[in-house]
């Protein structure tokens, strides 16, 4: 992470979960605290709008390796600088299994998308449908007045629908679910005791005509 932001065990995951646009890598001196040592070098990277934790992890691994080489060169050359972190920091604690369950009553479409991205490929965000555990691996978030969404749902009036209600489940058009603010479209999904697959293949074998995720 870009210290002192996200000290702790899961900085990459929390950057994605929180919908951050920028993260990065920091090299530092070790001390007695968790990620509290003086900083040496930093490198920023943009986080893609649809980028998952796994994808970002791979990019940062390469960047981190290159930054480490530069850091070691500076130490060897005697040009290294120590930069104190200061007290303006945030913590990135370990993820809990409980946070993987989607809370439809509190999270809007963008927050659910960030949850799905942040827990991919670790754990996977999930919900229950008809008592079965369904994992979401890739979703899109729409505002309710989005033109592209309107082309799919037509003139559907879903003002009386509750968060978690299925608006459309069609193997060709997709799976659309209402949230407290906005709509998500599920693109990659995993049924209970099944493998990950695109939503079209899933809907050809799993009937979701009406009902709600909870």
Region spans (language model):
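Donor/substrate-binding cores of folate-linked one-carbon enzymes
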Residues: 1-92, 96-98
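An anion-binding loop in the catalytic cleft
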Residues: 103-214
